[in-house]
UniProtKB/Swiss-Prot annotation:
This is Protein translocase subunit SecA. It is an enzyme of class 7 (translocase). Its EC number is 7.4.2.8. Monomer and homodimer. Part of the essential Sec protein translocation apparatus which comprises SecA, SecYEG and auxiliary proteins SecDF. Other proteins may also be involved. The lineage of its organism: Bacteria, Bacillati, Bacillota, Bacilli, Bacillales. ATP binds at Q91, G109, E110, G111, K112, T113, D498. It comes from Macrococcus caseolyticus (strain JCSC5402).
Length: 842
């Protein structure tokens, strides 16, 4: 309770501070009104001239804070002249909270788009770029189109970043002062920029300032969804089919247990026995059966926990994910870790090959890279603790311009779903007769279709908006506030379009919102309620629940069920009491708490990969920016040779195998016969290192002379290709480690610490592997001397060819996912023998 009290006290204080700023802005109103268009436009140039004199980011921020009241007044006046809209004081307050790097919580219909124009203009003056982030491309395009007139009038450029744009068009969009984009496209462009071969191919500038619309949807609801760029992995799909056939034979509570609350599934002893018999294995939990166990687990999850028309829909023979928070389908997105393939097997559609992750990032880590981050939404206060802890953004509830007139009825709870839906239909009929528009909110596609059937039987004309018919979304929402309209919508969250009341609807009580089930997130419920009573309009909302609703089943409806039985209440008699509302809210808080813990855990694990990603991307960028990477290459070669010497000549001198080292050095760095055993015998490590390095550097010089002025380009390409291939393999390895790490949570072992430690070891091994492979490629590649080598040739690896057969050449080096096994290394089969005496013979 202490945090909540502090939260609301803090909000009061913050609102007071914002009101002072709004008052200051209003003092410039008459002065701005008196300026000509040209004089008003010149204000932008004045600010920009001053900002160009300041290079330091913090000093620029201080200057922006200083000019804020006047600059906001400039935008207000320009908005009046260009758009015919004049921001209210509460919108100035919201805009100030956004500039401060916080979240402005503003109710539906309070004009968030206009509010954002002030901080967007102010921060765009620096020339560093401002990103306005929306949940879909339609909103990005519409907002950019509407607001570009204002920004262009003030001398600023506006770009829209869409998925369909070419590289050049994207670069132009990002070069603008203000760029509208979806969160997905920003994240993918960042990943793609860190996979380019030449710096000219990059499209983004350094991440400066982002304003996220529907910020809670993106930073909380989608926080755990990673953005993934993937390539095809060559894996058979037969295991998914076999696992699917097997789990269909299993019986609930006999062969496996399913926890409604956590959605966790576990095979029982009985189920394990069946699996061992079916797949003919002695011990299902043996390490060699990890892959089989994984397929059985995801097949179980697909069958039991993933529900058709709720978690996904089947469209044109494909599985399409349904966003649990918005009810929208997400074409192109796939469940990870083989779950998508398991669902494809379940639904008997074509199973697509698994993909291999080449680059990935979560929104949590992407948006934390901006210099300054802010947002706006209708509902975020309930998640302030998380937003503050993870993103360092406070949530300020901005007062409404006009008092809220909406009436929120208490929840009604019924014993069964049947009773609840009958009551909902009766309520719709009653209000529809009076001509009052009704919006019915459902949690799942299935429910919306069921209610639609009930209304059809009663002869009530209505529209359905769900994941299956999202094409008509704008049209349906536009008409939802008209007299007599009945609209059924799955999760109205993030729809981004206001429902405006038709003629004569105010007199009928405004829009009536009926929720048919509580969502596990209070924010989504609040967003549904918020569709009624916008901008001081009248409105009504009420939620109808049943003891069979998922939330009630998962969290303690037993007590209420017992109480209803004792009272002898039937299906048609609801309970309406504060106790019910408190119980529901308590259940929601528990779910939100569980989800927050899960997101926090995701972030803790993802932070391990984030630090590694930053190192790899920084290394890549350094290579891209340099014309000559020789110093980096030489450092890699030195490290590789040093490691090889220390590895082969450690411990008992009598055990030293000089022949093995000679073979290794010639295989990795030198031509055959370049090093003799006599040269290195009975010498210490430093002497051996110096001898080998002098020969290696001579070989390096030889390669340089062969390619002449193209050599530096050749080096860059080798480094980039090796880093990319090794990094891709490393992501895959880390993913497998993360999946399996929970199996170690026994005794005093902390899975996260284990993941951190092993992840670091794997990362170090990968870096060593990069050094070895870069050394081998650059020193051992055979170079075509016959013709001038073009930049594109080098890029494609065409500068490396086989020789004419006069010179004996070892096999071309390949980038492997594991380092080569030295002849004196322990054999990986676990026999304890050296590799040369075991599987390395012959």
């Amino acid at each position: 309770m202490g945090f909540i009290k502090k939260m609301f006290d803090g909000n009061k204080k913050e609102v007071k501070s914002l009101r002072k700023v709004a008052d200051q802005v209003q003092t410039f109103e008459e002065e701005m009104k008196s300026l000509s268009d040209e004089a008003l436009q010149n204000k932008t140039k004045e600010y920009q001239v001053e900002l160009q004199k300041i290079e330091d980011y913090k000093q620029q921020e201080a200057y922006l804070n200083k000019i804020l009241p006047e600059a906001y007044a400039v935008v207000r006046e320009a908005s009046r002249r260009v758009l015919g809209m004049f921001p209210f004081p509460v919108q100035i307050m919201g805009g100030t909270a956004i500039h401060r790097g916080d979240i402005a919580e503003m109710r539906t219909g309070e004009g968030k788009t206009l509010t954002a124009t002030m901080p967007v203009y102010l921060n765009a003056l620096t020339g560093r770029g401002v990103h306005v982030v929306t949940v879909n491309e339609y909103l990005a395009s519409v907002q950019a189109e509407e607001m570009s007139h204002l920004y262009n009038f003030l001398g600023l450029t506006v770009g829209v970043n869409l998925n369909s744009l070419t590289t050049e068009e994207k670069r132009a969009a990002y070069a603008c002062d203000i760029t509208y984009s979806t969160n997905n496209e920003l994240g993918f462009d960042y990943l793609r920029d860190n996979m380019v071969t030449y710096k000219e191919e990059r499209v983004m500038r350094p991440l400066n300032f982002a304003i996220i619309d529907e910020v809670d949807s993106i930073l909380i609801d989608e926080a755990r969804t990673p953005l993934i760029i993937s390539g095809q992995a060559e894996k058979s799909t037969s295991m998914y089919i076999q696992a699917n056939v097997f789990v269909k034979m299993l019986k609930d509570d006999i062969d496996y247990t399913y926890d409604e609350k956590t959605k966790g599934i576990q095979l029982t002893e009985n189920g394990i026995d069946k699996a061992e018999r079916m797949f003919k294995v002695d011990n299902l939990y043996d390490v060699k059966n990890v892959n089989l166990m994984h397929h059985i687990n995801i097949a179980l999850k697909a069958q039991r926990a993933m529900l058709k028309d709720i978690d996904y829909v089947v469209e044109d023979g494909e599985i399409v994910i349904v966003d649990q928070f918005t009810g929208r389908t997400m074409p192109g997105r796939r469940f990870s870790e083989g779950l998508h393939q398991a669902i494809e097997a379940k639904e008997a559609v074509e199973i697509q090959n698994e993909s291999k992750t080449m680059a990935s990032i979560t929104f949590q880590n992407f948006f934390r890279m901006y210099n300054k981050l802010s947002g706006m939404t209708g509902t975020a206060k309930t998640e302030e603790e998380e937003l503050l802890n993870i993103y360092n953004m406070a949530v300020t509830q901005i007062p409404t311009n006009k008092p809220v007139q909406r009436i929120d009825g208490a929840d009604l709870i019924y014993a069964s779903e049947k009773g609840k839906f009958h009551a909902v239909v009766d309520e719709v009929i009653r209000r529809h007769k009076e001509g009052q528009p009704v919006l019915l909110g459902t949690v799942a596609v299935e429910t919306s279709e069921y209610i639609s059937e009930l209304l059809k039987k009663k002869g009530i004309r209505h529209n359905v908006l769900n994941a299956k018919n999202h094409e008509r979304e704008a049209e349906i929402v536009q008409n939802a506030g008209q007299k007599g309209a009945v609209t059924i919508a799955t999760n109205m969250a993030g729809r981004g379009t206001d429902i405006k009341l038709g003629e004569g609807v105010k007199e009928l009580g405004g829009l009536a919102v009926i929720g048919t089930e509580r969502h596990e997130s209070r924010r989504i419920d609040d967003q549904l309620r918020g569709r009624a009573g916008r901008q001081g309009d009248p409105g009504y909302s009420r939620f109808y629940l049943s003891l069979q609703d998922e939330l009630m089943v998962r969290f303690g409806s037993d007590r209420m069920s017992t109480m209803m039985t004792k009272l002898g209440m039937n299906d048609d008699q609801p309970i309406e009491s504060k106790m019910v509302s408190r119980a529901v809210e308590s259940a929601q808080k528990r779910v939100e708490g569980n989800n927050y813990d899960s997101r926090k855990r995701t972030l803790e694990y993802d932070d391990v990969l984030r630090k590694q990603r930053e190192i790899i991307y920084a290394e890549r960028n350094e290579i891209l920016e340099k014309d000559d990477c020789s110093d980096q290459v030489k450092a890699m070669i030195e490290q590789s040779v040093r490691r090889a010497v220390d590895y082969h000549f450690t411990g008992d001198e009598n055990e030293y195998d000089y022949e093995a080292f000679k073979n290794y050095a010639e295989d990795m760095y030198l031509t055959e016969g370049a090093l003799s055993v006599d040269e290195i015998s009975r010498r210490d490590n430093e002497e051996i290192y110096d001898i080998v390095m002098s020969k290696v550097m001579a070989q390096y010089q030889h390669q340089k002379e062969e390619l002449q002025e193209q050599f530096h380009e050749f080096e860059r390409m080798i480094m980039l290709r090796t880093i990319d291939m090794k990094w891709t393999d490393h992501i895959d390895t880390m993913d497998q480690l993360r999946t399996g790490i929970h199996l170690r949570s026994y005794g005093q072992i902390n899975p996260l610490r284990e993941y951190q430690n092993e992840g670091l070891t794997l990362f170090d091994t990968m870096l060593e592997s990069i050094e070895d492979d870069v050394s081998k490629y650059i020193l051992k590649s055979i170079i075509d001397r016959g013709e001038q080598v073009e930049r594109e040739q080098v890029g494609k690896g065409e500068a490396m060819v086989a020789n004419d057969g006069k010179e004996k050449v070892k096999q071309q080096p390949k980038v492997k996912s594991e380092p080569d096994i030295g002849r004196n290394e322990p054999c990986p089969c676990g026999s304890g023998k050296k590799y040369k005496n075991c599987h390395g013979r012959g």
